[in-house]
Regions:
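N-terminal organellar transit peptides
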Residues: 1-133, 144-300
Length: 300
């Protein structure tokens, strides 16, 4: 009669079985390799549409949760390619990355591709280390807003503007009304507040790394990655693959974790939900032009 199995026998059998199973897994998927998941933060920051790929807190939150929830991750890499966009959305994404990094005790490394400008640079500041290509566009730490004035045009062609509003400033900066200097001053005050918050964030994250006068660093100017290194806006010149292989070894596994578009973002019969909405396509075309203009500001 066979002797009953002991706890040591069971543990030994499990170890051998586990080893055999691991041998069947391709090398690139084994957990014994260092793992650094990569999150792409690409496009104009704000609400996304079918023709305007962009970034928003709603669109990236679940992806960030998944990445920082990977127990075997040695670090988290952010691949950033953004000319900026909404200050609020930029800050929301920044805060979520910092909160998750602290909760999960994860080091975050940002890799700048074409650009990390304005809100895109705010995202980069969520990292513990920023690496840029020598030709990346970096900086543009400022706030910008713009509009058009159509009041003279509609008067010339005989169109009368009729606007009904409750609240003294509800129609502030209406493009079909003559520009009011007091409205412009209110807008500039709002922009100064947002700019001050942006400056405080950069100073808090970069601390003693910054190497330049405030008048230079926070003027809204942007620089190449190489020049940004001298100003202390980035920590190193390099690229994602080479840097991670140097830090974590040639066998480092860098899975790209894509954002989940969700049910409402999926396409039905080749058409997305947004495109089915009245005026959706026209709005997307305008958004696409605005996106193109924002990239063009940096020569991209």
């Amino acid at each position: 009669m066979a002797e009953p199995l002991t706890g040591d026998d069971l543990r030994g059998g499990w170890t051998r079985a586990r080893t055999m199973l691991l041998d069947l897994i391709p090398q690139r998927f084994r957990r014994d390799r260092p793992v650094v998941p990569v999150v792409r933060l690409t496009g104009v920051i704000g609400l996304s549409t079918p023709l305007r790929g962009g970034l928003s807190m709603a669109g990236i939150a679940r992806t960030l949760d998944r990445v920082f929830g990977m127990r075997n991750a040695a670090a988290v890499a952010l691949a950033i390619n953004s000319p900026g966009g909404s200050p609020a959305q930029s800050h929301l994404i920044f805060r979520r990355i910092r909160e998750l990094a602290q909760e999960k005790n994860r080091r975050v490394i940002a890799f700048i591709e074409d650009a990390a400008a304005s809100g895109g640079y705010m995202l980069a500041c969520a990292a513990d280390e920023i690496v840029a290509d020598p030709n990346s566009v970096v900086g543009s730490i400022g706030v910008v807003g713009g509009s058009f004035g159509f009041d003279k045009l509609i008067a010339k062609i005989g169109i009368e503007r009729r606007l009904y509003a409750s609240g003294e400033h509800k129609a502030m900066l209406d493009p079909f009304l003559p520009e009011d200097p007091s409205d412009v001053e209110r807008l500039k005050k709002l922009q100064r507040e947002i700019h001050d918050d942006f400056i405080a964030l950069v100073k808090a994250r970069r601390a003693d790394k910054l190497n330049g006068a405030d008048e230079t660093l926070f003027s809204g100017e942007y620089w190449t990655g190489r020049r940004a290194l001298g100003l202390g806006l980035v920590d190193a010149i390099g690229d994602l693959r080479s840097t991670l292989r140097e830090r974590y070894g040639d066998k480092v596994f860098t899975p790209l974790v894509s954002a989940d578009r969700g049910l409402l973002g999926r396409r039905v019969f080749g058409v997305s939900r947004d495109e089915l909405m009245p005026g959706g396509l026209a709005g997307d075309m305008i958004s696409a032009l605005e996106t193109r203009a924002l990239w063009a500001r940096y020569g991209l």
